[in-house]
Amino acid sequence: MTSATLTRVLGFLGLVPFMLPSYLMANAALFGSGLQSAAIFGLYGPYVFIAYSAIILSFLGGTLWAQARQSDDSSALMTILFSNLLALSAWACLLLIYIAPIMTVFSVCLLLAGYLGMLFAESLNDVSRQRKYWRMRLWLTFWVALAHLLVISLMMAEL
């Protein structure tokens, strides 16, 4: 198996922890007792979603850092700073859930913005010129964004 194939396989398998909690939360909201009944391993569904999302966004920030280190131009400095901003905002999302329900919704919005920002940042580097990888990133970001929008709408409906 090539590294490109492994990257694609792991990328799409990485959607499962986004989609499964989203499905369970939608099912609980539509057919159950609401999001409070959407437990995953005994944990509140939105918290599980946020935790995984924050970890993946931090990981992607690290990949952005690695891409920037391969370049010596001035944009590399901004990319490295942005990668740190992604990681810090993902960490903040893990803390925001303890403040108030509306801040939990805000944390999902912030994570969504992070994924869209990551895609934009990658579009500015050479990564967007790698056709197969870029197509995969677009699809993955589409599905991740859709899952975030679903979770946001489910949480807003319960406020």
What are the functions of these language-model segments?
Residues M1-Q70:
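Selected alpha-helical membrane-embedding segments in polytopic membrane proteins
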Residues R8-G14, S74-N84, Y133-F142:
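Cytoplasmic-side transmembrane-helix entry/capping segments in multi-pass membrane proteins
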Residues P21-A26, A90-Y98, A145-L159:
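Hydrophobic alpha-helical transmembrane segments in multi-pass integral membrane proteins
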Residues L60-D72, L119-R131:
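C-terminal ends of transmembrane helices
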Residues L64-L96:
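Helix-adjacent hinge/juxtasegments
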Residues L94-G117:
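Transmembrane helix-loop-helix
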Residues S123-L159:
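Terminal transmembrane helical module of multi-pass membrane proteins
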